[in-house]
UniProtKB/Swiss-Prot annotation:
GO terms for biological process: glycine biosynthetic process, by transamination of glyoxylate; glycolate catabolic process; glyoxylate catabolic process. Pfam families: Aminotran_5. It comes from Paracoccus denitrificans (strain Pd 1222). Belongs to the class-V pyridoxal-phosphate-dependent aminotransferase family. Catalyzes the transamination of glyoxylate into glycine using L-aspartate as the preferred amino group donor. Is essential for the growth of P.denitrificans in the presence of glycolate and glyoxylate since it functions in glyoxylate assimilation via the beta-hydroxyaspartate cycle (BHAC). Can catalyze the reverse reaction in vitro, and also use L-serine and L-glutamate as amino group donor, but with much less efficiency than L-aspartate. Keywords: Aminotransferase, Pyridoxal phosphate, Transferase. The modification N6-(pyridoxal phosphate)lysine is found at K196. Disruption phenotype: Abolishes growth on glycolate or glyoxylate, but the deletion mutant strain is still able to grow on acetate, succinate or glucose with comparable growth rates as for the wild type. This is L-aspartate--glyoxylate aminotransferase.
Length: 396
């Protein structure tokens, strides 16, 4: 089945034509120099997107979840202590993975709709006089709630506590779409995937290791085989992989990085912010609220929109797909049935966003919600017209 409509789930995202063509390539010998000429530019492109000159990048045939496993198994040992916040579906899942690997996780229960509590982290880290906490986990952009956390504040908490713990960041739904500064924020491991900001099909876990994280690899005793970065680094030095690589996706990653860097990282972030702000203007016009509780927490890659009490938000998602062939995101975990999500990341324009807003209006009106047709569209149009005019004036 092939839809001609844009997709508005928060990943996998719309795939531009040049990325589809790059992925759909003839088979090559992945043990030949040809593959090396494809691999190393992709690694360097990712470093630029991460805003790092120091990190080593690893590409595993997996998803963001495999990236998480890469992070913990390559740096930690059974019983090691980890600090995290439980403020959404994906922080819950990362904590669960740590516990399944035999790690000792201290977690701060945080309401869904709030960000990572850097102040509480600072208190806990300051109290850890023996520096038993080895790693701090933080989700930069919680996809289930549409909440952006302040990673720089988490780094400041570590520094204020004079604590040597490593900082691991889940940037699966932020990197490539929202400002991410691996070196400046002192991120030791950054995790993302191919299917969101990089605008590719699922299948690549993209992980950056700082020099400090690389040092931890040598003392880590958690079992790892497939995700062992030592084997991967050995393969890279020989222009190859320790096993068969996803050649087409790596070729696509080259095309993706070229596109992102040609647009300019700051322009990419500004475009995402402008489109997201238009969606938020529509939500206000509908009289609805976001799951994120304060403007500084609003995500520029996904909006989780609360529906009236007693209404099943899943009906919006199913009706949109069945009636208008448009895909929105369902609510997850604690907010399942309470929110629907509009993804606005990757390959997206103002006009594409307007089609999603208009469809959401039709769906909600069909289902009897008190939504005035055209209200959200008009609010978003006004925002896009004003911001486009301002950008053109600035460019002139």
């Amino acid at each position: 089945m092939t839809s001609q409509n844009p997709i508005f789930i928060p990943g996998p995202t719309n795939i531009p034509e040049e990325m589809r063509k790059a992925v759909d390539m003839p088979t090559i010998d992945h043990r030949s120099p040809v593959f090396g000429r494809m691999l190393h530019p992709a690694l360097e492109g990712v470093k630029k997107v991460l805003k790092t000159t120091q990190a080593q990048v690893f590409l595993f045939p997996s998803t963001g979840t495999g990236g998480w496993e890469t992070a913990i198994t390559n740096t930690l040992s059974p019983g090691d202590k980890v600090l995290a916040a439980r403020n959404g579906m994906f922080s819950h899942r990362w904590i669960d993975m740590c516990q399944r690997h035999g790690l000792d996780v201290t977690f701060v229960e945080t309401p869904w709709g709030e960000g990572v509590p850097a102040d509480r982290f600072e208190e806990i880290l300051t109290a850890d006089k023996g520096h038993e906490i080895r790693v701090v986990l933080a989700t930069h952009n919680e996809t289930a709630t549409g909440v952006k956390s302040d990673i720089a504040a988490v780094r400041r908490a570590l520094d204020a506590a004079k604590h040597p713990a490593l900082l691991f960041v889940d940037g699966v739904s932020s990197i490539g779409s929202m400002d991410f500064r691996m070196d400046e924020w002192g991120v030791d491991i950054a995790v993302t995937g191919s299917q969101k900001g990089f605008m590719l099909p699922p299948g690549l876990a993209i992980v950056g290791f700082s020099p400090k994280a690389m040092e931890a690899v040598e003392t880590a005793r958690l079992p790892r085989t497939f995700f062992d970065i030592r084997d991967m680094a050995t393969g890279y030095a020989r222009n190859g992989y320790p096993y068969t690589p996803p050649v087409g996706l790596i070729n696509g990653l080259n095309a993706s990085c070229e596109r992102i860097l040609a647009e300019g990282l700051e322009n990419v972030f500004a475009r995402h912010h402008r489109i997201a702000s238009g969606v938020r203007a529509a939500v206000d016009a509908w009289g609805l609220k976001l799951c994120a509780v304060r403007p500084e927490l609003y995500s520029d890659s996904v909006s989780a929109i609360r529906v009236p009490e007693g209404f099943d938000a899943n009906l919006i998602v199913s009706h949109a797909l069945e009636t208008y062939d448009m895909a929105f995101g369902t609510g997850l975990g604690q907010v399942a049935g309470k929110v629907f999500r509009i993804g606005h990341l990757g390959s997206l324009t103002d006009a594409m966003a307007l089609s999603g807003i208009a469809t959401a209006e039709m769906v909600m009106a069909d289902l009897g919600l008190p939504i005035q047709l055209g209200s959200g569209v008009a609010a978003a149009q006004e925002h896009y017209r004003q911001t486009t005019a301002a950008a053109q004036k600035k460019a002139a």
